[in-house]
């Protein structure tokens, strides 16, 4: 007698839709050079209990649908026994805490990584006076400041997730950096998360260029 296959606790059709959305956007980010050597991870809220996320160790420029898996909001695989990114908890803590967050993107561009090293000592990069600050949801003027927090890198994701958790309610955040690592950015959907990610990339690049121009020769 054949065992009855248990129904999936999520919509397979919705997963297929999100996999295509993720793969297309991730491929563009890979082509920009922001996901070197299989690095980076990406996710999208699937429903109120699950997220679609990239499988660990896959070339982000060559993803196929099987490279997108499902995890619950505790970071545990659901449906297929695949290994999610080591940093899955940094995604799921955002979905669990903020129901409005629909997409989380994590990249490793040179600009993001260099900025994270340069500002690790202060733990923050202040961005102010830029017109592009209005790219962040809720900002309506350049006459404001956005503090991008820089967290120390660690292989203990429980520790890092707890550090992030402690600061999520203390200021407006659209993303943060991890020292020597890269950038996390999020939004209500893929389009908004991409906008925030690209705004951070541009503004961090401007800050690095200003540092060079101000340095004595």
UniProtKB/Swiss-Prot annotation:
Cofactor dependence: Zn(2+)
Residues bound to Zn(2+): 106, 108
Keywords, ordered alphabetically: Amino-acid biosynthesis, Lyase, Metal-binding, Methionine biosynthesis, Zinc
Cofactor note: Binds 1 zinc ion per subunit.
EC code(s) of this entry: 4.2.1.109
Pfam families: Aldolase_II
UniProt catalytic activity: 5-(methylsulfanyl)-D-ribulose 1-phosphate = 5-methylsulfanyl-2,3-dioxopentyl phosphate + H2O
Pathway(s) it belongs to: Amino-acid biosynthesis; L-methionine biosynthesis via salvage pathway; L-methionine from S-methyl-5-thio-alpha-D-ribose 1-phosphate: step 2/6
InterPro entries reported in the protein's UniProt record: Aldolase_II/adducin_N (IPR001303), Aldolase_II/adducin_N_sf (IPR036409), MethylthioRu-1-P_deHdtase_MtnB (IPR017714)
Top-level taxon: Bacteria
Biological role: Catalyzes the dehydration of methylthioribulose-1-phosphate (MTRu-1-P) into 2,3-diketo-5-methylthiopentyl-1-phosphate (DK-MTP-1-P).
Sequence similarity: Belongs to the aldolase class II family. MtnB subfamily.
PANTHER family: METHYLTHIORIBULOSE-1-PHOSPHATE DEHYDRATASE
Protein name as catalogued: Methylthioribulose-1-phosphate dehydratase
Organism, scientific name: Xanthomonas campestris pv. campestris (strain B100)
High-level lineage: Bacteria, Pseudomonadati, Pseudomonadota, Gammaproteobacteria, Lysobacterales
Gene it is expressed from: mtnB
């Amino acid at each position: 007698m054949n065992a009855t296959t248990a129904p999936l606790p999520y919509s397979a059709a919705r997963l297929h839709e999100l996999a295509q959305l993720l793969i297309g956007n991730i491929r563009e980010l890979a082509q920009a050079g922001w996901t070197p050597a299989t690095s980076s991870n990406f996710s999208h809220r699937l429903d109120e209990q699950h997220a679609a996320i990239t499988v660990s160790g896959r070339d982000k420029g060559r993803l196929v649908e099987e490279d997108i898996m499902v995890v619950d909001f505790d970071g545990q695989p659901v449906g297929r026994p695949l290994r999610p990114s080591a940093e899955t908890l940094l995604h799921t803590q955002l979905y669990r805490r903020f129901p409005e967050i629909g997409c989380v993107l994590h990249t490793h561009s040179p600009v993001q990584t260099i900025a994270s090293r340069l500002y690790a000592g202060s733990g923050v990069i202040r961005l102010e006076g830029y017109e592009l600050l209005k790219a962040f949801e809720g900002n309506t003027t350049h006459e404001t400041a956005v503090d991008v927090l820089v967290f120390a890198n660690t292989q203990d994701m429980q520790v890092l997730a707890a550090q992030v958790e402690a600061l999520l309610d203390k200021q407006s955040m659209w993303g943060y950096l991890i020292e020597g690592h890269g950038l996390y950015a999020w939004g209500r959907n893929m389009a908004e998360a991409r906008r925030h990610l690209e705004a951070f990339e541009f503004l961090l690049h401007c800050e690095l260029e200003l540092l060079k121009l101000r340095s004595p020769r």
